[in-house]
Swiss-Prot record:
UniProt GO MF annotations: ATP binding; ATP hydrolysis activity; ATP-dependent protein folding chaperone; protein dimerization activity; unfolded protein binding; zinc ion binding
Domain of life per record: Bacteria
Binding sites annotated in the UniProt record for Zn(2+): C16, C19, C38, C41
Keywords: ATP-binding, Chaperone, Metal-binding, Nucleotide-binding, Zinc
Subunit comment: Component of the ClpX-ClpP complex. Forms a hexameric ring that, in the presence of ATP, binds to fourteen ClpP subunits assembled into a disk-like structure with a central cavity, resembling the structure of eukaryotic proteasomes.
Domain (ClpX-type ZB) ranges: 4-57
Full protein name: ATP-dependent Clp protease ATP-binding subunit ClpX
InterPro entries given in the database record: AAA+_ATPase, ATP-dep_Clp_protease_ClpX, ATPase_AAA_core, Clp_ATPase_C, Clp_protease_ATP-bd_su_ClpX, ClpX_bact, P-loop_NTPase, Znf_CppX_C4
Stated role: ATP-dependent specificity component of the Clp protease. It directs the protease to specific substrates. Can perform chaperone functions in the absence of ClpP.
Amino acid sequence: MGDNKSNGDSGKLLYCSFCGKSQHEVRKLIAGPSVYVCDECVELCNDIIREEIREISPKQDQDRLPTPHELRAHLDDYVIGQEKAKKVLSVAVYNHYKRLKNATPKDGVELGKSNILLIGPTGSGKTLLAETLARFLNVPFTMADATTLTEAGYVGEDVENIIQKLLQKCDYDVEKAQRGIVYIDEIDKISRKSDNPSITRDVSGEGVQQALLKLIEGTVAAVPPQGGRKHPQQEFLQVDTSKILFICGGAFAGLEKVIEQRSHVGTGIGFGAEVKGEADKATISDVLLQVEPEDLVKYGLIPEFIGRLPVLATLAELDEAALIQILSEPKNALTKQFAALFEMEGVELEFREDALKAIALKAMDRKTGARGLRSIVEGILLDIMYDLPSTENVAKVVIDESVVKGESAPILIYEANETQAAVAEQ
């Protein structure tokens, strides 16, 4: 090490002017006018500057709020269909963050929160919409499952744990957390068992709705730092939830029947009832478009809770064409993700049109919507992903309808232009 260092013109041992280490203790010593700095101090300075830039950048990004058109355009890149829901969400999210930017509005007019309720079947894109918006806006995002929540005093997850999770996502930075988005899934599962108020305790239903009321409307939640209640002497973090956007979602199975009873859409009983054919019946998605707050009360949500979710958007069930689009068109489409995985092995992956259609039909049969697509594709590609790293000279893998149906193995195209069917192990 000493061979690479000079002791200077005078032959004296040189030291870093910042940390005091000698030239023999560091890799490099940079000389200036009567000053020396070592490589370790240079690296430390770079780290400090990079950290400061990281802290400043998000604040600069937050200064400009994307317009509803820009929000919608970003959603279009990742979410197929659901045009009305995307429009409703874009406007609601824009208004929410505009309210935060103008904390003291003119004329003393106080702007209310625009929390959102999403109604749609499993796998229709409720979670994806919320997650995509949070990522685009560069704000903390967390998810909670309403079925795990209980009111205070009961065994289960306290509603304030939701804020705890949000804080964890931003390293307990309260300022960042207060600009975050919380998505509460399965909100329909905490509906009252009947629309008549009960004198008995309903731990998983109305009680949880009551517990969520203040949190969603806006309160100062006291959250223990770093998630521990073991040290009572620690000061609790104070989080203002009036600045947090809450998006609640649920499938609301059977809600269409409540709407039909109110609006008499496609219903009729007795001899005077009009008998409609299958083609004339309104689809569930069409009926849900007519949902009113009174229908949600009848379903089991308390009026106060519905009042805290003023923005309502319904999502349609995904049909075959939409599922095919989801497989191939979005920026992070499943076929593109698996193609990238195969590319890491130096192999091209191709899904033929008939294969995409067969995958979509499988998902529809399972009634899992877009959520079930990944498990179907994983199952189809399992054997080939297992064998491929050990197989040489494969240039391309082709998936067609017969592969999806399990009637044949994927087609392998080798570099020597030799094509053969992969032999599946029995």
